[in-house]
A protein has these predicted regions:
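N-terminal helix-rich module
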Residues: 17-29, 36, 47, 55, ...
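Phosphate-interacting basic helix/loop segments used at nucleotide- and nucleic-acid interfaces
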Residues: 40-44
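N-terminal single-pass transmembrane signal-anchor helix
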Residues: 1-23
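Conserved catalytic core of two-component sensor histidine kinases
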Residues: 8, 32, 39
C-alpha cells in the first residue's frame, strides 16, 4: 500500500512539473501566433490605405485591449483626430493584449498607436503605406512574454518578432528579440 502511495505521489509531482512547462510553451506559441497574424493585418492595412488612397490610423479598441481598430484620418494626416467609423479591425486571443510603450518593448520604437505624422498609414508611390519605422507591442497577460511587429527604414516590410523575459538593460535595442 505504501509503495502505491509513493508511486502515485511521484507521478503527481512529475505531472505538475510538466503542466507548468506546458503552460509556458502554450504562452510562447500564442504570442508568436499573435505577432505573425498582426504583421499580416498591418500589411493588409497598408494595402487598404493604398487602395482607398486615404490615410489610416491604428488604435487600440477602448473596450478591448485584444482588438486593434483602423480608422480614417482627419485633414491633418497625423492621426491626431481620427474620424469616427471603423474601417477594419483585428482581434487576438486573450490573455494576449496590445500595449502602448510597454516596459518589455524597446524604447526606441515609435508606437503606431500614437498621434503624430510618423504613425499614419499613408499611400506612398512605389513603397508600402506602412509608416517608415516603428511598430506594435503585444504582451501575454501580465507575463514577461512579448511579441512585436516592427518596421525600420532599411526594409520595406514589417517584421514579426518575439521574446520571453524582460531584461531591462536591453530595452533600448532589438538585440534579445527573435524574428519570426
Amino acid at each position: 500500500m505504501v509503495e502505491v502511495l509513493v508511486v502515485v505521489s511521484i507521478m503527481g509531482i512529475l505531472s505538475a512539473m510538466g503542466v507548468a512547462g506546458l503552460q509556458r510553451a502554450i504562452a510562447n506559441a500564442r504570442i508568436k501566433d499573435a505577432a505573425v497574424n498582426t504583421a499580416a493585418f498591418v500589411e493588409r492595412v497598408a494595402n487598404l490605405s493604398s487602395q482607398r488612397n486615404e490615410v489610416l490610423c491604428l488604435k487600440i479598441d477602448p473596450g478591448s485591449p485584444q482588438t486593434v481598430i483602423v480608422v480614417l484620418d482627419d485633414e491633418k494626416k497625423d492621426c491626431s483626430s481620427p474620424k469616427n467609423g471603423v474601417v477594419a479591425e483585428y482581434s487576438i486571443e486573450s490573455p494576449a493584449k496590445y500595449v502602448q510603450r510597454s516596459a518589455g518593448c524597446p524604447s526606441i520604437m515609435t508606437d503606431w498607436f500614437g498621434q503624430n505624422a510618423q504613425v499614419a498609414f499613408k499611400p506612398r508611390l512605389g513603397l508600402a503605406a506602412t509608416p517608415p519605422e516603428g511598430g506594435i507591442c503585444i504582451q501575454y497577460g501580465g507575463d514577461d512574454i512579448y511579441g512585436a511587429v516592427r518596421k525600420d527604414r532599411t526594409r520595406n516590410r514589417v517584421i514579426p518578432m518575439w521574446k520571453a523575459g524582460n531584461d531591462g538593460t536591453q530595452n533600448s535595442s532589438w538585440a534579445n528579440w527573435t524574428e519570426l
